Amino acid sequence: HAQGGLPIPDITHIVQHYWYQVGGADSPERPGIKMAQALEQKINELGEHRVAAYIAEPIQGAGGVVIPPDTYWPEISDICRRYQILLVADEVICGFGRTGKWFGSDYYNIQPDLMPIAKGLSSGYLPIAAVMVADHVSQVLIEEGGEFFHGMTYSGHPAACAVACANVRILRDEKIIDRVDTVT
């Protein structure tokens, strides 16, 4: 964010999972855990009552396709569960088979609380986006939030939704994601 700053108050960052920069001759497992533990250090620094969520891409696309060590995401997930912090896996880039699994989260065997999805939902044929919400989060919205206003003028366009449904059906029925997993 050095180029433009981040104008939203109360958003903070932790170190990125560039294990190849900090690991040296070490295996990626130890740096993966160490970098994930930066989240716990930040939680303790800020106070756990001030941290609502951890948001990240399973594989960081914006940073140049940065693949984390296998130990990184399970440790992040454990920390989020321990402190009751929402885990948000941004699946806009990793979703819908790009890792050989339906989602990058599946690749790392983690269960996010929220998953923003977009491009892969329609394979880019029409613009569409959504947020997948875990049952325990949606239940809070239902019980505590009353009405959840989320429909805007151009949201839920029938053509984009039809393309998304057809695309997901094709990915599933033609086992395209399975082929990505075995061929690449």
Region spans (language model):
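Conserved N-terminal phosphate-binding loop of PLP-dependent enzymes in the Aspartate aminotransferase
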Residues: H1-T184
